[in-house]
Amino acid sequence: MQSNSQIKRVFNQIARPLLAAGIMAVIIGCSAFEPEYGECPPIFAAKGAEESYLVGSKLGQIIKIRFNGISGQCVARDGYTDARLYINVLMRRDLTTGSNIEQAEFYITAAIIDETETVVSRETFLEEANFRDSMDTSQPDIIKRLDIPDGHRVVLALGRAAE
């Protein structure tokens, strides 16, 4: 008959490698779910539509808005690219007309353009930004997902297309 110390020793000899193998399997398994990121199709702001003005909804202040940065994280799929767009906008207001909280809604349009320079689809996003009390700038970060067909590009614009 084996003593308790022998049983513990045998258990530890078996349990430790199994525990280590289990931890490694979890780590390897988690990394298997991470997609393989690649190069994004061209994504840029349309000349003349990268800056605009709008009116705030609380105080009626004139707000200047412009793109402050556009980047993407893309995964190639069968016939298209799954793109996650990171869009940063910079908004400024004049505090001489009031410094209380201000709110503004604005549109961003993403046009998918093919190799013949034809707009094949358009997606418009309504966004909202706030100015805190006594703050003259606001920098909302926007994340949007788009499916971009192979051979196409994305052109972003502030505002929306006339219907």
List PLM regions with ranges:
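Helix-rich interaction surfaces within compact, conserved domain-sized segments
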Residues: A110, T116-E163
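Post-signal peptide N-terminal segment of mature Sec-exported envelope proteins
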Residues: G38-L59
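Generic short beta-strand segments
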Residues: N68-S71, Y86-R92, A161
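Short, solvent-exposed beta-strand/turn "edge" segments of beta-rich domains on protein surfaces
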Residues: L59-I63, S71-R84, L95-E102, R145-D147
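One-face residue pattern on beta-strands with alternating periodicity enriched for small/polar residues
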Residues: D82-N88, V155
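Bacterial N-terminal signal peptides that target proteins for export
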Residues: S3-L19
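Bacterial signal peptide processing site
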Residues: S31-E34
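C-terminal motif of bacterial Sec signal peptides marking the signal peptidase cleavage site
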Residues: V26-G29
